[in-house]
Amino acid sequence: MEEVDRILIHSLRQAGTDIDEDVQSVKQFTSELIVEAVVRCLRVIDPAVGNGLSHSLPPGMSARFRLGMSLAQACQDVGFKGEIGYQTFLYSNEPEIRSLFMFLVERLPRESAEASDQPAGKSVLLQRAIAAQIKAQLSVPWLPPTCRLPVHRKTQSSGPCHSFHAQPLSLPCSLKVSSRKQPKEVQEYWRNYLLPVTAQPSQPASVPASLLENHISELSAAQEWESEWNSQGLLSRLTPEEYRSRKKARLQKRIEEQLRTAAQPRPDTHGATRSTSDLAELLQSFGGASTGGDVLTKGTRFTHTEKFTFTQEPEKAVQQMAAAASALPSSQQSEEDLKAQQEAELSALQQQLQQLSVQMEEVGGGIKQLTVSIQQVTDELQTREVTNAERENSVKIKRQTIDLLPDAENNLLKLQSLVESSSKRVVQLASQWEKHRVPLIDEHRRLKELCSNRESESSRKLSEIKDLHDKIRQSAEEAKKKESLYKQLLTEFETLSKDVSRSAYTIRILEIVGNIKKQKEEITKILSDTKDLQKEINGLTGKLDRTFAVTDELVFKDAKKDESVRKSYKYLAALHENCTQLIQTIEDTGTIMREIRDLEEQIETENGKRTVSNLEKILEDYKAIRQENSALAAKIREG
Amino acid sequence: MATPELMLSLGLIEKDVNADTLWVWCYPSIDADLREVMLRKCCLTLDNQVLHTFVFGQFCRTWYYITTVEVQEPTVLKKVTHFSIVVTAKDFNPEKYAAFSRVLCRTYMKHGSPVKMMEGYIAVLTKGICQSDENGSFLIKDYDVRKALLAGSLKDVVSQFGMETIILYTALMLKKRVVVYHPRIEALLEFTRALPCLVWHRKDWSILHPFVHLENDELENLKVCTGYVAGFVDPEVKDRSDLFDVFVNLPDSEITVSQNAKEAMSMGKLHKEIGNFIVQAAEDADRSDAQVIKDISVKTKEILSNLMSLADHADNSKLTLECLKQGHYPPATENFLFHLAAAEQLLKI
């Protein structure tokens, strides 16, 4: 019971009850302490129930009685099944109180225990650390600047705070540009002229921010590349460099295509030619410049378009401005002169325009005619060429025929025989060729099959490799997670108060469990002993009965003949009866002994219930109530 | 007409169990460019197992006829799943070569050796006849080129497009570029071969490219020609405005004239007249396709003789724009006649 009590007292202390150090067991609990402990527990379990109750016993007897009643009710509401009433609290007895406390302690919520079971990530750890730091800083009182010690200056002065302002840094070794591929000049620049990173940003305060930014961008780029390589690159069966260059070419082609489709000339839109030429220029510059550049560096496209828009426009603008400036008339001339001059100029220009448009039309008609005639001529040329070739062929044949004409009949026969023989020869040759061709084709097919088999094998292996990669990554992640969890737990373990009670409890519990096991073994041993004894007894009784029956019969037979035997028969019967009585008596003694033991136990439990002291207390309380009642009655009478 | 030396070569493409399509044999020779084009056309290289038993087309003035057969029953060809027989020739006569290649196919299926096939080929080349094992023999005389040219049905074209047929007529008369799109090759072949009948007086079937892929070599070959009728199965051709003046979307029965050909293709009263004439001629149930073609041809010749009459006889019977202007035609007609004169090579240069 001692162990149980200590655990109970520990839990009650945690729930907020103020228990003296010298209180070691439930037996020592006073009524006040019991009430306080129960109320505190109830407040934790169910705040709505517990908050309506006071945790100290009131002085008035009737008030105490009421508190006891409401406490009992609250306990039943929470779910306590045992016997409970005001007397449990006011006239306590040890077992009842213990069972009540055990119930209440079990119902106490265990959020702290559950929370520590869940694994927390790095961010949680960080947040916790931040929270702890803030808490520590908040606990330090604010001091006016003059009173601050160096310790406080660090956290309370606003001096070292800077906004997070990152600037691009130039680094010789980075993921984007490997140092080996760079030209000599760049390397020399790095070696001799590049400032250290700490000197690169305009303000020294932005050095850490810039470094962090730089690092993060490189990290994310590396991760992106890794994931892409694992998902697509590996399957393409290329080396990383090849894959990169292929991707670059693909992107370039796509962009070019997009621009080309956008630049398709539309006859109805004015100025389309201008935009197309500009776009063509852009395309050219894009194609030229990007061959040297790195496609992976973001912004290549944008820098080019930027260059394009900002370099072309100013030049044109300057030209236009110059033209406009020269056309401006000098402001010194009079206005009328100016007007007349303008009109004259206008009419002259209009005339010019008309002339020009007429000319344009004429020339346009001419062009149209010419294009049509060009079409005709090319068409004619083509047909002529075709017919020419045909004619040449026919001329050749005819010439041959003419050569053969003089001896027509003979030649005809000769030709026929020639045709026949050569066709036979050709067929023969073909069948010979077949002898070579068929094995070659078969060989080709066989090799192809082998090749495709190999290919499928390799793709299978590739997928296996990919799976393996995935697994490796997963395992690495898991390992990382576990490691962080381990670290977290380790820190938690270190921060934990070195409360030995817990380990002591576990050890005790283990000991108790061991003891219980031992006891159980002993009990089973005793039980089996008892069983054996019972068996033996039964066997003996049976033996006795049988022996008696046999002896009885034998002796009874002889008793009829012999007088002395009759006597001995009588003795036998008497002996048997006496023995039975003896056994009966022994059994009775056993039962009585057991009853005595039961009664003794009952007496002990009754003693434990502090009946005498409780009765005295009840008597006193009764007297107090009566006094109160009489006082009240007197007051009424006086009133 | 049908002289045997029109045939140029005979080839064999096989697809084997490794799904590998291969040129396995040819006689006498086929150059590498044409071989590549044939591989594309024979539909064995495609993964989808749609089999086109007979396709034909033109590449570089050479006509090709491809018959594809699936090897089903166990034969001597163990590792072969499909094979195509390619016949190239100078002349356009799908029916003749379809029949001939069927005979060759059966021979090859039976013997599994191209030697027998070649014997047949040489027999046709030298004697104009090929003995088939079954079903009698193949006689080259049975297939007249005129029949082949008349095989396309103009009536079907007119029944599908009605009055819009005049656009096709004008485009062909002016030697414009006509592109026809249909996802099915067979429909494409059937439709496109009828179109040159609209300009029967030229009897020029070399403008016909019934089956073209959007590949550079074929497009280059196409661009050399001034006017053509080209069939495509790839719907992307619709966006290639550089390839056509007139685009025919066959499944949707739509004809579009491209922007830069609009001016040359502007139509007037004359076109309406001709259009009505064509529709009437084609709708007459009693008239055969050949008669319809003849009617249109007569009408065309009428126009041409009109045009000729305007020409300056002193000047080698050639036309100039001034001569045309003397005729006082409406501008659309004048424009048409001018372009027609160019197409018929009647312009004075």
Swiss-Prot record, chain A:
Residues 331-370, 459-541, 591-638 form a coiled coil. InterPro entries: CCDC22, CCDC22_CC, CCDC22_N. One of its GO terms (molecular function) is cullin family protein binding. Disulfide bonds: none annotated. Pfam families: CCDC22_CC, CCDC22_N. PANTHER family: COILED-COIL DOMAIN-CONTAINING PROTEIN 22, JM1 PROTEIN. May be involved in regulation of NF-kappa-B signaling. May be involved in copper-dependent atp7a trafficking between the trans-Golgi network and vesicles in the cell periphery. This is Coiled-coil domain-containing protein 22. It comes from Danio rerio (Zebrafish). The lineage of its organism: Eukaryota, Metazoa, Chordata, Craniata, Vertebrata.
From Swiss-Prot, chain B:
Residues 160-294 form the cDENN domain. The lineage of its organism: Eukaryota, Metazoa, Chordata, Craniata, Vertebrata. GO terms for cellular component: late endosome. Disulfide bonds: none annotated. The keyword Metal-binding does not apply. PROSITE patterns: DENN. The gene is dennd10. Residues 296-349 form the dDENN domain. It is found in: Late endosome. Transmembrane segments: none annotated. This is DENN domain-containing protein 10. One of its GO terms (molecular function) is guanyl-nucleotide exchange factor activity. The keyword Zinc-finger does not apply. It holds the Pfam family SPA. It comes from the Eukaryota. Belongs to the DENND10 family. GO terms for biological process: endosome transport via multivesicular body sorting pathway; protein transport; regulation of early endosome to late endosome transport. Guanine nucleotide exchange factor (GEF) which may be involved in the regulation of late endocytic pathway homeostasis, including endosomal positioning, maturation and secretion. Residues 1-135 form the uDENN domain. Keywords: Endosome, Guanine-nucleotide releasing factor.
